[in-house]
Amino acid sequence: MRSRSSSLEDTGKAGLSSPRGGTRRDQANHSSRRPQEATPTIHRNHRQREHKPKPKSRDLTRDDLLFLLSMLEGELQARDEVITVLKAEKIDLALLEAKYGFVTPTAVLKSLQRDGLQQSSGWQEDIYEKPIAELDRLVEKQRETHRRMLEQLLLVERAHKHTLHRLEDEKKNHRDFMKKSDDFTSLLEHDRERLKQLIDQEKTYQERKEEESNKQVTNLKDELTKLKSFALLVVDEQQRLTEQLSQQITKVQELQNSAGQAQEELNSAQTRLQDEENKVLRLEEELRKQTCHFHQEQDAMTAKLTNEDAQNRQLRQKLSSLSRQLDELEEINKTLHRAEEELQELRDKISRGECGNSSLVSEVEELRKRVLEMEGKDEELIKMEDMCRELNRKLEKEAKQSCSLKAEVDKLNHRIMELEKLEDAFRKSKQECNSLKSNLEKERTMTKHMSNELDVLRVRIKELETTEVHLEKTELTLKEDLTKLKTLTVMLVDERKAMAEKLKMMEDKVQNSTGKLQAEQDKVNTVTEKLIEESKKTLRSKAELEEKMCVATRERDELKAKLKTEEEKSSDLQSKVSMMKKRLQSLETVERELLRNKSKEEHTKSPGPYRYQQEDNKVKDLTQEVERLRRKLKEMKVVEGDLLKTEDEFESLEKRYSNEQERAKALMEELETSRKELSKYQLAEKEESNQEQILYKRLKEEEAKSSHLTREVEALKEKIHEYMGTEESICRLKTDHTTLQRKLTQQEVRNKELAREMETLTRELERYRRFSKSLRPGMNGRRFSDLHVSTKEVQTDPTDSLSPNYKNLAPLERALVNGKLYVESDPEDEANYNEIHLTKCSPSLMNSVNNLNNNMRRVRGPFLKPRENHHAVNNKRQNGNHVQQGDVVLTHSPGQPVHIKVTPDHGHNTATLEITSPTSENAPSYTSTAVIPTTGAPPKQRITILQNSISPSGKPKGSPPPPESPCTPDRSLSPLTMTAYSQTLTSESCGPLTPDRALSPIQIVSVTTGSPDRSEPAELLGGQTVLRVSPERQNSWQIQRSNSTGPNVITTDDNKIHIHLGSPYIQAVTPSAKPIGPYYSLGPEPRVPVLNNGTPAKGNNKITSSIVIKPTSGPISRPSQITVSNLCD
């Protein structure tokens, strides 16, 4: 395992090549981590030098030398850049805040500081001007608070005197009150005698009243008999009238029913009439239309018939003329036939010659002429025949037409018959309509008559209703009269009963009043006795209070004197503090000048980051001083707040006292008013002692006054209770005085703490001087503080040659537990004075403790008072190492080996650390997981070791432990947070030691007890290991604080385990490391491959480092030995 200085040199000179031996060794360390033997570092380095082959002498040309020079210049420039970067990273935030005034963009401020370092510009401002100004303000504020305290004490003294005067006044008032109470008892006795006389008078009055009431009862009985007879007559009349009313109501109802039925019939008849009228009107319109149509058709037909008749007549006339002509022609034809026959006969005769003569020939000739004429007439006859034929044809046509006309006429006759039938029906309907109209008129007349009758009935009903109303009114009046009579009778009976009851009640009241008077007399006697006893008690309490107030005044004077002495002490301490500050400032100036001169001389030799470690140490001390001053400021503010609270409480007490005085005044006024009322009552009694009504009034007034007296007695009791409340308020004042005294004692304790802080400051000054002396170079270039440590190997034996600066760190370690300052105070004031947190941080001890406090639980570690009990052994040095109270010391039985296995898993970039004790069966085993860095940067690791298979603790994390037994099993139930400090001091085998190696930051190994099931985020400080130990296993292990000059140390009894993980100068980037991957459990001494810059070699993936602690026998008081194996598989 490499030491811290070598790892720091690796981080500062990674990737640089120089002809120096240190850089070559660093390159060799980066390229391959060789297994180192368990021998001291100096011997190993000498062995390496012996085995190094000497480089062959080679003549180089000028060009080669120039090339080498250019390469070296480039490497030097790169080294300077790395140095500036590391300086900027390691610069304290407090310095940045002091220079730039703000801290928030840290990266920007660091880059500005880095540029300033490259330009070699130093600090221009003084950082500690503001704290000095704040100290001056604090001194002025303390003076003001002192003045205010004195003013408040004067006000309290005045108030005390005022309360004493008030108590004397109260005594006088109480005496007066006792005298008045005696007068009041005498008045009550007189009232008792007067009430007895009143009771006798009341008895005589009641006897007279009984006689008068008996007379009134007899008179009322006679009146009752008369009223009963009158009431019977009234009831008979009422029954008769009700019967008449019922008969009239039935008649009215019958008439109303008949009228309703007639109205319904009328309504139905009216509906029927309306329907029939509508039908008749419709039929009349149809008949009118049909008659008009028939008349028109009849006129047309008659016109046609007349025309046809005329034509028929003409034709008949023609026929008759033609028939006549035919007859004439037939007769002529007959005559002609006869003439022809005669002619033929004649011809025959002529031919025959029978007869011949001239006359006949003339006759024949005449006959021939006639025949010719007749032939001419035959043509006419033919024409006439033709004409007759045409006429026959026309006649046939006319006959046909006449037949058709006859048919039409028949049809018309049928229709006329139908129309006549319709006319008959119409006539009948008209007759029916006329009859219906007549019926309607009759019904209308009937309805008018009925409506008139209805109106008459309504008028009669109204009259009946009015009569009903009058009857009801008369009935109501009669009922009212009856009820009045009944009520009168009942009232008379009730009055008689009431009079009897009143007589009994008056007797009972007289008896009750006598009993009440006796009870009130007893109460008054008891109240007077109680008042006398309470007055005696108040006098005693007042005397006791006066004594207590005298004692309180004495105590107050003593407290004032103590305050003055404490203030003088605080002023002396402040003056000493100012002197120490001035001395510190002068020393700082001297140290700055020395450091500037040394930095100019060693700028070419030593690397850059170590220059600023001296400034870091100075900043450490100054930040501690600033934090102490801030704590003092906070304490003064708390004292001011307490004083303000006491002022408010005193004002509230004054208000209460004034309220109680006002109440007492009000009670006295009420007593005076009651006395005035009693005097008025006595005067009124003397004036109106003979009147009866006044006796009733007096009885009521006496009852009211008795209640008033009871109220006054209650008010007196309340006043006594209020006096008791004043006593309680005085007790509270006493408690306030005790709290003030307690606070004064706390102030004294704080002054003692200031004195102790002064001692610590003086020790720090001495340590600072020793540091400055140790920083001066020695004879061979080394520093005096580094001469006793020269190995890179893990130291297993205890060393008593501790550096003087860490011997002086014990008070600091007592004052700082887990990054917080704890003040021991009384348990009552723990809420006000519990913890004061540190605010500023630096890369020094305060910075590391504060960063550790962010991830650890709070623990209140008492450190001011030394514990003189059976646990004081834990404060002694064990093996030269100081064990602090508040740290858990884990003991382990000697003679048993402890195996520590480290099994990395490069698939997940984690490593598992396992601590076991294989021999004991019930020994606890612890496992942990850390992240392995894969880049070339230096490792940043924090290992959280958890105990395997333990039950979680019962208490919560934040519960504070008892302060009496910090290292005993009594504290196993509460989780604890423990810190151990150790300084990392490294040596270099070749080359002069740099001044920064003795001033490396303090490494912290923390052991936290608590429930392991909650995995808290782990923040890495450089080279920090966190062990979690369950509360059940605290009795078997012991972790001691190591103040040796080696790296981080966890000790088991007399054995030491020094575990170094990474560079202390580089802060953590990854805040948490979660256990990922399986745990590999290998043998006790497995071989592991070599790591190149934090990455595994190309062999097997499993790398295991184990530390086995085995007991050895020898004359040295070191019973265990550490075997470190780091071998390849």
Curated annotation (Swiss-Prot):
Record bears the keyword Coiled coil: yes
Annotated coiled-coil positions are 188-776
> Is Coiled coil one of the keywords?
yes
State a GO cellular component annotated for this protein: actin cytoskeleton
Q: Spell out the Polar residues composition-biased ranges.
A: 909-932, 1114-1129
Residue spans of biased composition, Basic residues class: 43-55
Q: Which family does it belong to?
A: Belongs to the FILIP1 family.
Q: What is this protein called?
A: Filamin A-interacting protein 1-like
**Which species expresses this protein natively?**
Danio rerio (Zebrafish)
